[in-house]
């Protein structure tokens, strides 16, 4: 989404987005996605300096931006999110490489659920890449959260251009 109206996105809507996002399945029910809502002008300026120039104004005018991150410490909460399999999870996740890979995979999956939840509630999304190392230093330094995606959200202004081509079934699937 290139432009958004000035209609506000409420805290109740943000809560509902989170709740819908976390209904989707993840391996081990791990739920490694973390969401940082960017709502203040000060936080937004800290965010936009880590975006490419073409996306900075889009982010500035969006009612809300979300930084989606994976939590490398997700295993520490296994007793909460999957108490029946907590020991299995810990026995599987024995290296930092495995823990990080699982966190990234789960958070990427949840990022898709996130954008689907936003759209299901009648809002629009604009996913953006960023300087993720810079975002880490800016917002998450010293924590186990590592950003993977920035998403602008709000009520979109219809564009004058038609939707770009989407691949068809035969272009992207095969049956064996």
Q: Where do the language-model regions lie?
A:
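Acidic, glycine-rich active-site loops and adjacent beta-strand->loop/helix elements
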Residues: 41, 72, 131-134, 157
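Short beta-strand segments
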Residues: 67-69, 129, 152-154
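Short proline/glycine-enriched turn/loop segments at secondary-structure junctions
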Residues: 137-143, 163
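Small-aliphatic-rich amphipathic alpha-helix that forms the alpha element of a beta-alpha
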Residues: 21-23, 66, 86-137
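N-terminal amphipathic, basic helical "cap/leader" segment at the start of enzyme domains
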Residues: 1-77, 175-176
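Short, flexible, mixed-charge acidic loops at enzyme active sites
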Residues: 78-88
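Short coil/turn connectors at secondary-structure junctions
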Residues: 60-64, 123, 144-147
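C-terminal helix-cap and adjacent tail motif
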Residues: 1, 147-176
């Amino acid at each position: 989404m290139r432009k958004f109206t000035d209609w506000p996105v409420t805290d109740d809507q943000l809560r509902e987005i989170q709740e819908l996002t976390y209904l989707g399945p993840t391996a081990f029910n791990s739920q490694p996605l973390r969401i940082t809502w960017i709502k203040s002008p000060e936080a937004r300026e800290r965010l936009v300096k880590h975006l490419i120039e073409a996306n900075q104004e889009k982010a500035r005018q969006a009612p809300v931006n979300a930084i989606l991150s994976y939590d490398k410490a997700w295993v520490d909460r296994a007793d909460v999110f999957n108490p029946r399999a907590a020991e299995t999870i810990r026995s599987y996740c024995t290296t930092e490489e495995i823990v990080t890979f699982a966190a990234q995979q789960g958070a990427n999956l949840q990022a898709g659920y996130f954008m689907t939840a936003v759209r299901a509630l009648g809002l629009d999304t604009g996913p953006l890449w960023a300087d993720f190392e810079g975002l880490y230093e800016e917002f998450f330094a010293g924590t186990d959260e590592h950003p993977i995606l920035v998403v602008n959200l709000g009520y979109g202004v219809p564009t004058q251009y038609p939707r770009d081509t989407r691949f068809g079934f035969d272009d992207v699937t095969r049956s064996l």
